[in-house]
Amino acid sequence: MKNKLINTLAFVGIALISTACSQNTQSQVQQPNETPDKPWSVKMVESEMARWPESWQLDFQPKLKWDYCHGLELQAMLDVYDRYGDDKIYEYALAYADTMVNADGTIKMYKREEFSLDRVNSGKFLFRIYEQTKDEKYKKALALMRSQFEDHPRNEDGGFWHKKIYPNQVWLDGIYMGAPFYAEYAFRNNEVGVYQDIINQFLMAARHTYDPITDLYKHACDVSRKEKWADPVTGQSQHSWGRALGWYAMAFVDALEFIPQHEAGRDSMIITLNKVAQQIKRLQDEKTGLWYQVLDRSGDEGNYLESSCSVMFVYTLFKAVRKGYVDPSYLAVAEKGYKGVLEHFITTDDKGMISITKACAVAGLGGKNYRMGDYDYYINEQIRDNDPKAVGPFIMASLEWERLQEVRKIVNN
């Protein structure tokens, strides 16, 4: 209750600032001009539950899978449940948890020995499932995933490999997949000794992927410089992929709230987050408020405005402003981006179901069907509607937007 009050008071202050500045920014940022009969976050959750009646079907799955997309979207759905209620949402998330987690705490389709950070993100929503049910199997499942970090392969500077099959590689995606779970587990279980390890994951990734020429973070880095996709000098991949930076950005705002303010290195995390925020602001498309699939080739032929990175950036900036990590001026960037998402990516069918369009289905580096990570690769990967990697962050961004509107009503009244 105390933390909620502090956050509300802080956001009221931000709302006062943004209201006072509204006359100056009116020409730049318009309010989203369509108000649904329900909050956008609720409409998207209801639409997804209608599209995929069984929660294991999320991410277009024909069979059971322990997948980071399920964790992402179900976490967002539980955020909606926490804010607006509706037991159907909770039961939907619980059904996946109950199906996938066995009575002894083992998890179907989860293989610890694969050392995949992706499989850890799948379990973040279990914290709240355990809180609600007090079923010990969820506590055991959380401990199982936490134990992965004890043996997970690392680079010499302590950075986790993205996966065992990707040795010596740091992917920005992986920071989101592992660090927020690690931080929340540490917070809930009083593991004060691991915060430095968590902070190091963020700062290590920044050191390895930052390109001073473009002033951007590249998708990944092979610290060993052995991969064909890696620059022989820096080890970095060729391009800055929008969603990779989106994952990294969201990881900051989600992990920081669990790291004590006095912890050494936390300030460095916030400095790096501000650097990311500056990049997001600089690369925002002036006309639409959105962001491109390949950030360092924004506006080039074949490149396109992509929904998943756009909603990730919007969510990050909204939350970073609310938490006081970045300057309140970034609120205008977030609002312009959110308006752009509603105008260019959100569609409504004749039944009232909403969809989010134009999301890159997948992008990676190396692997069996070797991916060089060149420009043509990124712009030619499959594009699809209602990809969870866009759906989940859209729900999260919408919740931040809705929270801001409620605070503004309080301020204006």
Predicted regions span which residues?
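Bacterial N-terminal signal peptides that target proteins for export
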Residues: 1-10
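C-terminal motif of bacterial Sec signal peptides marking the signal peptidase cleavage site
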Residues: 18-20
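CBM-like carbohydrate-recognition segments
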Residues: 29, 33-69, 83-90, 99-117, ...
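Long, well-ordered core segments of solenoidal/helical folds
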Residues: 37-57, 91-109, 140-159, 192-228, ...
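Acidic/His metal-coordination segments adjacent to aromatic residues that form catalytic metal sites
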Residues: 50-56, 101-108, 159-164, 224-238, ...
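Inter-helical turn/loop segments and adjacent helix faces that build the functional surface
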Residues: 84, 185-196, 255-267, 320-328
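Extracytoplasmic mature domains of secreted/periplasmic and thylakoid-lumen proteins
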Residues: 105, 112, 116-179
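Oxyanion-binding "anion nests"
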Residues: 249-298, 302
